[in-house]
Regions:
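Histidine-centered catalytic micro-motifs
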Residues: 20-32, 183-192
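Short hydrophobic "helix-edge" motifs at membrane interfaces and signal-peptide entry regions
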Residues: 15-17, 69, 177
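Alpha-helical scaffold segments that flank or form the walls of functional sites
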Residues: 35-106, 131-149
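Conserved acidic residues
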Residues: 7-8, 81, 224
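Short, function-defining helix-loop hinge/capping sites that tune catalysis or transport
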Residues: 29-36, 168, 195
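Histidine-rich, glycine-flanked metal-binding segment
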Residues: 1-19
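Metal-coordinating catalytic core of metallo-dependent amide/deamination hydrolases
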Residues: 92-229
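Short N-terminal targeting/anchoring amphipathic segment
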Residues: 12, 24, 84-86
Length: 229
């Protein structure tokens, strides 16, 4: 056996495994409460019947605080120490999640969702202008808290997916990503029904990814993570 140099603290981990913390590139924090359930529907129906109604509850600050507390607690107790996380479309709830992650000592990119179409009235922003104004408020708050480009928990521009964000909204999000110099995340090519839907919504595009790239949200100057593709 080797002897440690004088003054070096020795920690004995005999019988244990030391491993780097894992990185999860795609998490939906508000979906944690029903993880492993509601598996009876295909994606697009599943969103409408289960996901959007649950995420709409995060408009309530108390609900968001408690829901995210369970998520952050269990994430901290897992092997995942860094993640790219989707929150909801609610600015204040997204900030609550970011604060809880920071206080727990975790590292993450977190996204306030952009959604102004193809979801229930109870879970949709009024229009692109309103959504962009809230996104800017969120980014300005991050800047004021010195988390825009520094610290373990930072913002990430997040149109939920192309069917959820109008062309005007996507264009504005691309401009905000460039203006604030922050990365982006979304979904891409999750299943055949979604791919067909995007093709119908974006007839001028040749492939799904182009619905993002034409607005500067597909790599290049804006680092981008696309889930499920």
């Amino acid at each position: 056996s080797e002897t440690a140099p004088a003054g070096v603290k020795v920690l004995d981990y005999t019988g244990k495994i030391i491993t780097p913390g894992l990185v999860d590139l795609h998490l939906h924090a508000p979906q944690y409460s029903y993880c492993g359930t509601a598996m009876d529907l295909e994606l697009l129906d599943w969103l409408q019947q289960y996901t959007y109604p649950e995420e709409a509850h995060y408009a309530d600050p108390a609900y968001a605080k408690l829901g995210y507390a369970y998520f952050v607690r269990d994430l901290k107790n897992s092997a995942t120490t860094r993640a790219c996380i989707f929150a909801t479309l609610h600015t204040d709830a997204t900030l609550e999640l970011m604060h809880q992650l920071r206080d727990a000592g975790l590292s993450a990119f977190v996204g306030k969702l952009g959604m102004d179409r193809n979801s229930p009235d109870s879970y949709r922003e009024p229009d692109a202008a309103a959504g962009l104004a809230e996104t800017r408020r969120w980014l300005d708050t991050c800047r004021a808290e010195n988390t825009l480009h520094a610290g373990p928990v930072r913002p990430m521009i997040t149109p939920r997916f192309t069917p959820s964000a109008s062309d005007e909204y996507m264009k504005g999000l691309g401009e905000l990503a460039a203006e604030y110099k922050v990365p982006a995340q979304s979904h891409l090519s999750e299943n055949p029904s979604e791919i067909e839907w995007v093709a119908a919504l974006c007839p001028g595009t040749k492939y799904y990814g182009e619905s993002y790239s034409r607005y500067g949200l597909f790599g290049g100057d804006v680092p981008t993570v696309m889930a499920h593709c």
